[in-house]
From Swiss-Prot:
Predominant subcellular localization, coarse grouping: cytoplasm
Name listed for the protein in its UniProt record: Pyrroline-5-carboxylate reductase
MF annotations from Gene Ontology: magnesium ion binding; manganese ion binding; pyrroline-5-carboxylate reductase activity
Keyword Secreted: no
InterPro entries noted in UniProt: 6-PGluconate_DH-like_C_sf, NAD(P)-bd_dom_sf, P5C_Rdtase_cat_N, P5CR-like_CS, P5CR_dimer, Pyrroline-COOH_reductase
Top-rank lineage group of the source organism: Bacteria
Alphabetical list of HAMAP family matching this protein: P5C_reductase
Organism: Mycobacterium tuberculosis (strain ATCC 25618 / H37Rv)
Keywords for this protein: Amino-acid biosynthesis, Cytoplasm, NADP, Oxidoreductase, Proline biosynthesis
Enzyme class, first EC level, given as a word: oxidoreductase
Annotated gene: proC
Length: 295
């Protein structure tokens, strides 16, 4: 079935489920092709009233759905996946045609494949918090029964909330450490920059405005330069590494002997790179500890 004609069931109406719902609607999806399963009455009412979407049980939502996005908390996965498996079997859906997409942190593809009907295509997706404003990045890892077309269709689904890339499942713990936890690193840096700005005489409001806009503008510069480099603009090599692009931009805004050079010297002296590396390593290790695989 073509993605444009597909029915999408979102199981779990929390922040990520709502982000995907709102993103799909912004991208032009028809509300009649979307259904949400949410157990909390207040939350269910909110979603129904805000988006005019059908909110029902998981068992009803999965019936006739081409894509089933599981967006519940890890602690709720076992009973939810049991309900979905039973509903799928009862509805006699073709397991090879119904794609399950999990955004549940730490739950492996093998776990879902072991609980769902044999041959069910499973894609594991790792979006980050920026999906809430349509500017996230999602890493996808495909299970063994997923066809190239199905993976392309799932990628199109997550295009609605930001950028999408595909990685082996073995890299998802690293993805979690970089992009999943990444917004928190960013917010901590902004917090520190604002505090430092107040320390040199700025009001907190002015320091916050300056820091936030500087971060947004710097990210825009990096993304634009990456796009130029990867497209071979100005005769440059295709596929230039992002770290080299960032390094070039940093050099371009750092005058020898100037204020930025003095500031960067202090960051290096304070172990900035080592702290970032240690943080990412710790997040990756914790993600590995939280992983749930088939028994």
């Amino acid at each position: 079935m073509l993605f444009g004609m597909a029915r999408i069931a979102i199981i779990g109406g929390g922040s990520i489920g709502e982000a995907l719902l709102s993103g799909l609607l912004r991208a032009g999806r028809q509300v009649k092709d979307l259904v949400v399963a949410e157990r909390m009455p207040d939350r269910a009412n909110y979603l129904a009233q805000t988006y005019s979407v059908l909110v029902t049980s998981a068992a009803d939502a999965v019936e006739n759905a081409t894509f089933v996005v599981v967006a519940v908390k890890p602690a709720d996965v076992e009973p939810v996946i049991a309900d979905l498996a039973n509903a799928t079997a009862a509805a006699e859906n073709d397991s090879a045609e119904q794609v399950f997409v999990t955004v549940v942190a730490g739950i492996t593809i093998a776990y879902f494949e072991s609980k769902l009907p044999a041959g069910t295509p499973v894609v594991r997706a790792m979006p980050n918090a920026a999906a809430l404003v349509g500017a996230g990045v999602t890493a996808l890892a495909k299970g063994r029964f997923v066809t190239p077309q199905q993976l392309e269709e799932v990628s199109a689904l997550f295009d609605a909330v930001g950028g999408v890339l595909t990685v082996p499942e073995s890299q998802l713990d690293a993805v979690t450490a970089v992009s999943g936890s990444g917004p928190a690193y960013f917010f901590l840096l902004v917090e520190a920059l604002v505090d430092a700005g107040v320390g040199v005489g700025l009001s907190r409001q002015v320091a916050t405005d300056l820091a936030a806009q500087t971060m947004a503008g710097s990210a825009a510069m990096l993304l634009e330069r990456m796009e130029q480099d990867q497209g071979g603009a100005n005769g440059e090599l295709m596929g230039l590494r992002v770290d080299l692009t960032a390094s070039r931009l940093r050099a371009a805004v750092t005058s020898p002997g100037g204020t930025t050079a003095a500031a960067l010297r202090e960051l290096e002296r304070g172990g900035f790179r080592m702290a970032v590396d240690a943080a990412v390593q710790a997040a990756k290790s914790r993600s590995e500890q939280l992983r749930i695989t088939p028994e």
